[in-house]
Every structure is written in structure tokens, then in C-alpha cells.
């Protein structure tokens, strides 16, 4: 429940359209393991702010390879959508997320203060 509440806190609200999105849920034995969102047709400045792909894995299921598999699937979907590259971001201290991005071909392109939390974020590009 705490994990779901955290997801709700980070959900954007309002009428502003930020492009189109696909949301994938990862279940195992009827239990939500993780979720992933592909945000496509975003204006470029938003790609570099919120990323084209976002994902999260239930804390008890982390470090089991779920995020790597989810991101791999998302990249296949992005190719099918005709995307040539995707931008992903994570907090600098989120080593697990950085490893997930790197395992899927990510290349670090920028490091800057996060627009929401005042924390340092790293941004990666994955060429498709």
C-alpha cells in the first residue's frame, strides 16, 4: 500500500496533455510487481525533463531483474512506434535504476538538479 501511495504522489494531475502514453503493468501470480510508462510524442524539452520511459518495481521485488526485462520490452515497443531514441532519467543515488538503464544500452548524457526534489538526476539516451 505504501508503494502505491508513493506512485500516486508522483502522478501528474491537471488538464495539460503531455503527449501520448502507454502503461504496462507487470504481474506475477496476480500480484503487481511493477509498472512502466512509455511517454511518446513528447515535446523534446519534456523528454529531457521527465524522460520518455518511467518505471517502478515493488520494493520487495527489486534486484530480481524485473526492471531490466520491463525496460527491454518497452524498448521493443518504442521501436515499433518508430521512435529512434529514448531519454530516461533517474536520481543519481538510484544505482539500481542506473544499472537497469546501462544494461539496456543507456549512455549518460547529462546530470542536473531534479525539477521536483532538488536532488541530482542523471539522464541517459538509448539509441533504437
At which residue positions do the language-model features occur?
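Conserved acetyl-CoA-binding loop-helix of GNAT-fold acetyltransferases
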Residues: 54-57, 63-76, 80, 99-103
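Conserved GNAT acetyl-CoA-binding A-motif
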Residues: 78-89
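Conserved catalytic-core motifs of GNAT/GCN5-like acyltransferases
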Residues: 89-90, 105-122
